[in-house]
Amino acid sequence: MSVKAAEVSSLAERINWEKVDGLVPAIVQDFQSSQVLMMGYMNQDALAKTGETGQVTFFSRTKERLWTKGETSGNVLQLVNMSLDCDNDTLLVKVNPIGPTCHTGTTTCWDGDPQEESQMVWLHQLEQLLAARKSADPDSSYTASLYARGTKRISQKVGEEGVEVALAATSGDKAELVCESADLIYHLLVLLQDQGLSMNDVINKLKERHK
């Protein structure tokens, strides 16, 4: 039994299966962006299979069988970790989604809701866009041209924008400070992507230092 399977098995023992009539609600959340993707139900077999395979599996109440998300579309949900709420009757499942989660082709099952997206979700989407630009035609966008010019040029831009931020702060122009900070963060994100990193790596380091 893998470590992940053992952890899931231990979690299953804590669930109040009688209270949930054998089906525990499972809220699925993107591990990187914290965006809620979907909600499904798991019985004990679905939970065990999720732990064994590392791919999120539900119990389909309509088909009355186990259903691994993405088994036909390929848009699987790769398990990162899961936890129980305080009443031991609802799961929070954190995943790395491969492709869109909703059967309609949207990122989440709530994409039709006009609710305002969180800043972290938006930032994650920006990082995905920047990552896609790495393989784009250098003439197609400024970002693609930066990648084409290499790490040295990207690093130079980060340095230049850092100076611009400092000058804006010194001048006391708050509007200019916001604009220059946006430029700095954008170029920093490009540099991180160039090096195979993301803002999550930076955030994790900040969390580590905060302990």
UniProtKB/Swiss-Prot annotation:
Annotated spans, Phosphoribosyl-ATP pyrophosphohydrolase: 123-211
Domain of life, source organism: Bacteria
Location of the region described as Phosphoribosyl-AMP cyclohydrolase in the Swiss-Prot/TrEMBL record: 1-122
BP term (GO), one: L-histidine biosynthetic process
GO MF: ATP binding; phosphoribosyl-AMP cyclohydrolase activity; phosphoribosyl-ATP diphosphatase activity
Catalytic activity: 1-(5-phospho-beta-D-ribosyl)-ATP + H2O = 1-(5-phospho-beta-D-ribosyl)-5'-AMP + diphosphate + H(+); 1-(5-phospho-beta-D-ribosyl)-5'-AMP + H2O = 1-(5-phospho-beta-D-ribosyl)-5-[(5-phospho-beta-D-ribosylamino)methylideneamino]imidazole-4-carboxamide
NCBIfam families in the record: histidine_hisI, PRK00051.1, PRK02759.1
Name of the protein in question: Histidine biosynthesis bifunctional protein HisIE
Organism: Vibrio vulnificus (strain YJ016)
